[in-house]
Design a protein with these regions (language model features):
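Active-site-proximal beta-strand elements of phosphoester/diester hydrolases
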Residues: 1-6
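A short, histidine- and acid-enriched strand-loop-helix "catalytic/donor-clamping" loop
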Residues: 9
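Metal-dependent phosphoester-hydrolase catalytic domains
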Residues: 12, 16, 26-36, 41-121
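Preference for well-ordered, secondary-structure-rich cores of eukaryotic proteins
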Residues: 19-20
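Short, well-ordered alpha-helices that flank and scaffold nucleotide-derived cofactor binding pockets
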Residues: 23
């Protein structure tokens, strides 16, 4: 299980950060062992800088048969984008969810909604 929070401003920092995390996921985890990488990547799904992650791992949102494509960033009600991801390798994504329907007693508990994955391995 790996987690990261990539830079939110610099394009080069995003690209290099994603490449580093992808590379380290391959180096740290032996072949055949399930890997799950979660995090605020601070990039929209069509950002080319996610390419290195998608080469090393699968995007759970894209491969899960049951998938939630709602936004994960709410900007405290002022913005709505997909910035949070779960990537996996050597496991099968079953269901990807954005947890934004619960009532926590406040309109927003964070500027991001949690994401969840049901997987088998």
């Amino acid at each position: 299980m790996l987690n990261t929070h990539l830079d939110h401003i610099g394009k080069e920092a995003k690209r290099e950060g994603a490449a580093l995390v992808a590379r380290r996921s391959l180096e740290l985890v032996p072949d055949g062992v399930p890997v799950f990488l979660t995090g605020d990547m601070n990039m929209l799904p069509d950002n080319e800088s996610l390419g290195s992650l998608r080469e090393a791992l699968e995007d759970a949102r894209e491969v899960a048969p049951k998938s939630d494509h709602r936004t994960t960033f709410n900007g405290w009600g002022n913005d709505h984008r997909i910035l949070d991801y779960i990537f996996l390798r050597n496991a099968k994504a079953v269901e990807f969810s954005v947890l934004r329907d619960a009532d926590y007693g406040a309109p927003y508990i964070s500027d991001h909604y949690p994401v969840a994955l049901t997987a088998t391995f």
